[in-house]
Amino acid sequence: MPNFQKPFSGSSDGNSVMNDLGNKVAIKVFDCRSAQDGSEEQNVNVTTNQMYLMFQSNNYNVPPPNYNTEDLGSQGPPTHAYYAPFQHPIHLQPPVPPVYKNNTYSATDQYSDSSFPNTSGHTPVIDSNYYNDALASIPTTTTGSTTMTTDNGNTIDSEEYIDNMEVFSSEENENIDNVKQTDLKSEKDSSLLSAASIVKKEQLSGFENFLPLSKTESPLVTADEIKSSLNLENIDNADSMSFKLKTSPIRKHFHVKPKRITRVRTGRVSHNIIEKKYRSNINDKIEQLRRTVPTLRVAYKKCNDLPITSRDLADLDGLEPATKLNKASILTKSIEYICHLERKCLQLSLANQHLSNDTRDSFVHLTEPSQPLSDNSSSEQVQKQTRSCQRQRQRQPRQQQPLHNIQYNIPHQNGLMSGTNNSHDMDFNNAGDF
C-alpha cells in the first residue's frame, strides 16, 4: 500500500495537473486506516519527477472510495486534486529450476526430467550445479534476480547460481561420464539412486547365479532392487563395490533359447549324389567321343587355334568337320562316323572276297596235270581255256558293280555323306587304324 503524504497547497499546480489529465474525473483518495475511522484525511503530494495516475474506478491498486466522506467535512480547498504515485504491481514469480547445460550430450529426451544430469555414475551427484538443501523461506523476486534461503541459513542468488552452473558445466562436461566410487552404506540416503540408470548385464560379473533364469519377459531392474536382493549393506568399507551404471536397460530374467537342431535328410542327399555322379559320367563319355571321332577332333583344334596335322586330314576320309561342339553335334557326328566305318568295312570285305576267288582259280589252274594233246583235242582244249578266260573277265565286272552302287539309308544331317567311295580310292596303308 503506498504511503500517502500531506496535501500540496496552491491552485496553480493543481490546475496544471488537471489540465494535463484532460477531462477525466478526479476522485479523492483516503488512507484505509484513517478513512475507515473517519478521523483524518491524507492527501497525495504531487512532484514533477514522478509518474502519476489519476485513479479511476477500475484501478485496483488503491482502496475503494469512501462514500462517507461527506460527513467528515471539508478538509481542504475544493480546487485541490489528490494523486498517488504509480507503482508497478508486484508479481511473485515461482523459482525456475536450474537447467543443466551439457554440450557433449545435448539429447535429454530419454530422461523424464530435463534437469536430471546425464551421468553414468551410480552414486548421488555431488555437484555445485544442483542445490539439494530444502528451502525454508519463500523466494523473493527482485528486478534482476531471485533470492532463496535454505534450512541451514544459506542464501542463494539466482544470477550467481546460474553463472556458477555455466562455469562448472563447461569445465566438467568432458569428465561427466567417469564413474564415481563411494561407499555402499552412503547410498541408502541418496535420493537420486532410485531414479538413476539401469545396471548393465555385463557389469554384474560374479552375481549371475543370484538372478533366476526364466523364459518369460519381466520388468526392468534398478540398482536399489539389486542392492536389496544381494544384501550389499553388510559388506565392509574395504570390500565396497561400485557398479557402472549405463543408460541401456537390461532384463531381470535372461531369456535362454535352445539351439535348433537341424536334421539331415539322408535320402535326399544320397539321391543328389547319385545324380551328380550320373551327370559327371555322361560328360566324361561325351568328352571321349570328342577326342576319338576325327571330325570332332579337327573341329576342336580349329576352335582352339591348334595345329592340324596331315594325319587328322587323312582320318577325315572325305567327311566334313563339325561346326559346333555341343552335345547334340557330338552325338550326330559320332553316328555319322560309325555309319562311315560300317560302309568302309563292307567295301573292304567284298574286295577281300574277290581277291580270294582270283587266287583260288589261279591256284587250281596251276595244279591241273599236263596231258598229251592231239590235234583235235588240243584245239578243243584251247577253245575251252579261252572261253573260261572270257567268262572270268565277264564275271569280274559283274562282281565289282555292287561295290560302286552300295547305298545306305542314312539321314543326311550336318553334312552326312552317302557311300560313294571307289574301291580304287581306298587307302590300305591306314587299315590298321580301324
UniProtKB/Swiss-Prot annotation:
Record keywords: DNA-binding, Nucleus, Phosphoprotein, Transcription, Transcription regulation
Biological processes annotated in GO: positive regulation of transcription by RNA polymerase II; pseudohyphal growth
Claim: Transcription is one of the keywords in the record: yes
Major localization listed first in the record, in broad terms: nucleus
Biased composition (Polar residues): 368-382, 402-423
Coiled coil regions, renumbered to chain: none
Entry-linked InterPro entries: bHLH_dom, HLH_DNA-bd_sf, Regulatory_TF_Diverse
Molecular-function GO terms, alphabetical: DNA-binding transcription activator activity; protein dimerization activity; RNA polymerase II cis-regulatory region sequence-specific DNA binding
GO cellular component: chromatin; nucleus
CDD domains, A to Z: bHLHzip_scHMS1_like
Subcellular location: Nucleus
Post-translational modification: Phosphorylated by the cyclin-CDK complex PCL1-PHO85.
Region (Disordered): 365-434
Stored Pfam families: HLH
Residue intervals of the bHLH domain: 266-341
Complexes and interactors: Interacts with the G1/S-specific cyclin PCL1.
Function (record text): Involved in exit from mitosis and pseudohyphal differentiation.
Protein name, as recorded: Probable transcription factor HMS1
